[in-house]
Amino acid sequence: MLRIGLTGGIGSGKTRVADKLGEWGAAVIDTDAIAHALTQADGLAMPAIIQAFGPEAVRADGAMDRAWVRNRVFREPQARACLEAILHPLIGQETQAAAERAVGSYLVFVVPLLVESGRWRGQLDRICVVDCDPETQIKRVQNRSGLTESDIRRIMDAQAARATRLKAADDVIVNDGSTTAEVLLARARSLHQSYLALADKHDRHGSTEAGPP
């Protein structure tokens, strides 16, 4: 099956694009959603997170306190490394299992830190970046969350630079502040049609056996 990596900075609109591709028949695996599931109450990652970070890292409902952990990992590089060491192997296992079950015209992995990880390129046929300017990212995230501008900028600073993402891209969907919902839909549909053609060619000529990292 043709494998597409879909990425973009926070607030870029990659989830909206992924949702549309899924509606049109692609199999979509969202690694951020997997990470959320792992850190919910009784999630597979929670015992190790509690052991590493203590009870302060857990909300009253038993899920990981994302705000507390986010502040901790921004302050302490070793805390970030510890969290990644807990989550990344579990995310990889769950992603692999989901890919093996996937049914669709082609497979889309939604990976927020795809470019940063450096491990995905060899497992993908193409990388698609949903791109927008930083100010638009900030406005969108402020509108949907309680994060302050400084918090958002810290998250953005921890992600790959815009130019770095664009350099890694095989395909780009522009979703800046002037992009209407109709225009974004048209751009996503055009890309979907090109992926269908590539998927047909890919399936006729065989596919790789490797799974995601």
UniProtKB/Swiss-Prot annotation:
<feature type="binding site">
    <location>
        <begin position="11"/>
        <end position="16"/>
    </location>
    <ligand>
        <name>ATP</name>
    </ligand>
</feature>
<keyword id="KW-0547">Nucleotide-binding</keyword>
<keyword id="KW-0808">Transferase</keyword>
<comment type="similarity">
    <text>Belongs to the CoaE family.</text>
</comment>
<comment type="function">
    <text>Catalyzes the phosphorylation of the 3'-hydroxyl group of dephosphocoenzyme A to form coenzyme A.</text>
</comment>
<feature type="domain" description="DPCK">
    <location>
        <begin position="3"/>
        <end position="202"/>
    </location>
</feature>
<dbReference type="GO" id="GO:0015937">
    <property type="term" value="P:coenzyme A biosynthetic process"/>
</dbReference>
<keyword id="KW-0963">Cytoplasm</keyword>
<comment type="pathway">
    <text>Cofactor biosynthesis; coenzyme A biosynthesis; CoA from (R)-pantothenate: step 5/5.</text>
</comment>
<dbReference type="GO" id="GO:0005524">
    <property type="term" value="F:ATP binding"/>
</dbReference>
<dbReference type="GO" id="GO:0005737">
    <property type="term" value="C:cytoplasm"/>
</dbReference>
<keyword id="KW-0067">ATP-binding</keyword>
<keyword id="KW-0418">Kinase</keyword>
<dbReference type="GO" id="GO:0004140">
    <property type="term" value="F:dephospho-CoA kinase activity"/>
</dbReference>
<dbReference type="InterPro" id="IPR027417">
    <property type="entry name" value="P-loop_NTPase"/>
</dbReference>
<dbReference type="InterPro" id="IPR001977">
    <property type="entry name" value="Depp_CoAkinase"/>
</dbReference>
<protein>
    <recommendedName>
        <fullName>Dephospho-CoA kinase</fullName>
        <ecNumber>2.7.1.24</ecNumber>
    </recommendedName>
</protein>
<dbReference type="Pfam" id="PF01121">
    <property type="entry name" value="CoaE"/>
</dbReference>
<keyword id="KW-0173">Coenzyme A biosynthesis</keyword>
